[in-house]
UniProtKB/Swiss-Prot annotation:
InterPro entries: aa-tRNA-synth_I_cd-bd, aa-tRNA-synth_I_codon-bd_sub2, aa-tRNA-synth_I_CS, aa_tRNA-synth_I_cd-bd_sf, Glu-tRNA-ligase_bac/mito, Glu/Gln-tRNA-synth, Glu/Gln-tRNA-synth_Ib_cat-dom, GluQ/Sye. It holds the Pfam family tRNA-synt_1c. Its main location: cytoplasm. This is Glutamate--tRNA ligase. Monomer. It is found in: Cytoplasm. Keywords: Aminoacyl-tRNA synthetase, ATP-binding, Cytoplasm, Ligase, Nucleotide-binding, Protein biosynthesis. NCBIfam families: gltX_bact. It catalyses: tRNA(Glu) + L-glutamate + ATP = L-glutamyl-tRNA(Glu) + AMP + diphosphate. ATP binds at K258. The lineage of its organism: Bacteria, Pseudomonadati, Pseudomonadota, Betaproteobacteria, Burkholderiales. Its EC number is 6.1.1.17. A motif ('HIGH' region) lies at residues 23-33.
Length: 478
């Protein structure tokens, strides 16, 4: 980013919406994190704006490229690619130091030599006096004030001269009007003794340089917002519009976090969830469009706005997520499902040549209404390409001696009939009539022997897709 702080446009023309997602790469990205990316991405798409990815990696000890890769992988899977970025804060240190020097020259910051021990003692006195712990301005230059002597060999921090008196007010798009008295805010450290800038300062410089118009983030950042607004205004810039999203709770009602058992977003991919189902579910986890529960990505982007963001914490419900996924599976084209299932079958040893026989889309069509994940659909599909082990309990219940002659007769009839659903159904009728049986008495054991369970879609459709040779071999195990 090359835009300087002094060159931002002040024209009256409507600004192009520019949003950002700014994760810290200190671990995997979970659903609570990714929802904080979903809404700014959706708002940028809905308004024809830009979505920027910024990696806030100033915590060098905890940040890793592996964590960045997981963030990028999760966003790519969900189809939330940024228009710009990723930008890395550690690569912008020269820019931050340039702005710090500018602020020092303007008297907006000052060096503070108070030691950690002195700060701890100050906090202890304030707490004993039942006061809010805060920096007391010992080193803040004021007219007529004598500062303490500068201690030898001590590198100072730089503190921002927070305004005295008045208040910080903003109209939050989720929380409404928020007002914080400046007297509640102490002078924030914006550079450490080694000169490295701190989070709240870097964020403001980035948001200005990247021309961010809307900051949509978790409400754990609310306390940072008045401090950031004051830095914006000290630099002569108006802050962006803020929308602070309520917390996402896990199923136990706790804040979703890695410590509380949250899973990486990519694990949901591995567990067989569709990206469009995840977007649908996450969208509803804090936003609504009337009573619509199931919608496409295109509908979401058409409908999304900031006015319908919820104010209450949303609770994750995996059973509901599976239901949403099941609805999307049913609505997904069979060819696409086949493309998604094929790699899962290949991972289980099914040769690519077998998968190219044209059956897989038809198998997906037959079973998708019974499945809530791609894993479940792949399990069904595997029956048609791999080996099958009948459920022992169902085998004992249905494959009884009394029905074995009928199974043998059906096997003979299927060996000779034309291979289509109608001919297979006719073979069943012929054997049932000859053996004096009803359909369930024969269909149930045939299902158990051929696909492993007594509960399947129409038996003639299943057998047609299984193929004559597999059926003959499996019926011989009766």
């Amino acid at each position: 980013m090359s835009q300087s702080l002094s060159s931002a446009s002040s024209s009256g023309a409507p600004q192009r919406v520019r949003t950002r997602f700014a994760p810290s790469p200190t671990g995997f990205i979970h659903l609570g994190n990714i929802r904080s990316a979903l809404y700014p991405w959706a708002f940028a798409r809905a308004t024809g704006g830009d979505f920027i990815l910024r990696i806030e990696d100033t915590d060098v000890e905890r940040s890793s490229q592996a964590a960045v890769d997981v963030i990028l992988e999760g966003m790519q899977w969900l189809g939330m690619e940024p228009d710009e970025g990723p930008f890395y804060q550690m690569q912008r240190m020269d820019r931050y130091k340039e702005v710090l020097a500018q602020m020092q020259a303007q008297g907006l910051v000052y060096p503070c030599y108070m030691s950690v021990a002195e700060l701890d003692a100050l906090r202890e006195r304030q707490m004993q006096a039942k006061q809010k712990p805060r920096y007391d301005g010992t080193w803040r230059p004021e007219e007529g004030k004598t500062l303490p002597p500068v201690p030898e060999g001590v590198q100072p921090v730089l503190r921002f001269r927070n305004p005295v008196g008045g208040s910080v007010v903003w109209e939050d798009k989720v929380k409404g009007r928020i007002e914080i008295q400046n007297d509640e805010l102490d002078d924030l450290v914006i550079a450490r003794p080694d000169g490295t800038p701190t989070y709240n300062f870097c964020v403001v410089v980035d948001d200005i340089d990247m021309a961010i118009t809307h900051v949509i983030r978790g409400d754990d950042h609310v306390n940072n917002t008045p401090r950031q607004i004051n830095i914006f205004r000290a630099l002569g810039k108006e802050p962006p519009v803020y929308a602070h999203l309520p917390t996402v709770l896990n199923e136990q009602g706790e804040k979703m976090s890695k410590r509380n058992g949250a899973k990486p977003v990519t694990q949901y991919r591995d567990e067989g969830y569709l990206p469009e189902a995840m977007v649908n579910y996450l969208a509803r986890l804090g936003w609504s469009h009337g009573d619509d529960e199931i919608f496409s990505r295109e509908q979401f982007l058409e409908w999304f706005d900031l006015d319908h963001l919820g104010r209450s914490a949303a609770q994750f419900d995996e059973a509901k997520l599976r239901w949403v996924n099941a609805q999307h599976l049913k609505a997904t084209a069979d060819e696409r499902l086949a493309e998604l299932v094929a790699p899962r079958l290949a991972a289980r040893g099914i040769a690519q040549s077998e998968l190219a026989d044209g059956r897989l889309p038809r198998i997906c069509a037959l079973f998708k209404d019974r499945c809530d994940t791609l894993v479940a659909l792949a399990d069904w599909a595997h029956v048609f390409y791999g080996e099958v082990t009948p459920n022992e309990e169902e085998r004992a219940k249905h494959v009884v001696d009394a029905v074995k002659p009928a199974i043998a007769a059906l096997s003979d009839a299927l060996a000779q009939c034309a291979w289509d659903k109608a001919s297979i159904a006719a073979a069943f009728k012929e054997v049932l009539a000859a053996q004096g049986l009803k359909m369930p008495q024969l269909a149930m054991p045939v299902r158990v022997l051929t696909v492993g369970t007594a509960h399947t879609p129409s038996v003639d459709a299943v057998l047609e897709l299984l193929g004559r040779e597999k059926i003959a071999a499996r019926l011989r195990t009766a």
